[in-house]
């Protein structure tokens, strides 16, 4: 049975769990135009984005999941909807040097490290706060040495549905290491799989 608290019909009970001592849940964002987004704080996964087309009909424009178990499986195998970090992309041979120190990571893509390995940001529970109906603040502490990366890092990410039916993501990261002691870039990525309705063929925006 579809839940009536959100346009997608996702049941909040299907996303309530405790993983590594942290609570997971379903968060619903809405803007003043009725656009709606559902998110779980596991992996900061976006589960649905209900956006209006040019006729005012709402459609889900991303590939999403009905349960936490399905979202965990798909984000682990295919990263769908999840936030990738500390480093998105491939690290050649799973190794890098910062200053005079070499770091070696898990190899999960033949002889390389893909999207920070199997214990990246997409596999952890983020702290979540909803300051207002159209925003969700997600916070993560990534300890020194976790997944093989140096430095204690605090990541803050804000999901916002704008009044013009946009989806904005703001990232912020702080570390306790000197600039020369951590990787010069932290390319975090929120992986979206867009699913634009094709029937009938029409202009959505």
Located regions from the model:
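Surface-exposed acidic/polar loop and edge beta-strand patches at domain peripheries
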Residues: 2-205
